[in-house]
């Protein structure tokens, strides 16, 4: 079997993209939080956001994925 059709990345125009292929929005959100903390330690701000990669094409999150992201934000420790 091949790769999953959809995975998630964190990416920004200045800080660039993480090198991970997150299987879930929750994992991508934890990666984003890590980048935010790292940027703060460097005295800057993270410009990354979570994007979906669907069959090799980067796209914005759709409604059900935005709901998953909202849930991840509310339940993050």
Question: For each predicted feature, which ranges?
Answer:
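Short, mixed-charge low-complexity intrinsically disordered segments
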Residues: 36-77
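A short, exposed loop/beta-hairpin motif centered on an aromatic-Gly-Thr core
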Residues: 14-30, 63
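Extended, non-core accessory segments
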Residues: 4, 13, 34, 75-77
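Short aromatic-glycine-(Arg/Gly/Cys) micro-motifs in beta-strand/loop hairpins
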Residues: 1-18, 45-56
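Short linear motifs in intrinsically disordered
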Residues: 1, 28-43
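Sequence-level detector for tyrosine residue identity
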Residues: 7-8, 27-29, 71
């Amino acid at each position: 079997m091949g790769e999953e059709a959809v995975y998630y990345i964190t990416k920004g125009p200045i800080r660039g993209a993480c090198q991970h292929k997150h299987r879930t929005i929750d994992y991508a959100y934890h990666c984003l939080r890590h980048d935010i903390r790292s940027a703060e330690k460097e005295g800057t701000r993270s410009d990354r956001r979570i994007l979906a990669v669907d069959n090799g094409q980067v796209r914005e999150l759709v409604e059900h994925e935005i709901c998953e992201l909202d849930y991840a934000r509310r339940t993050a420790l």
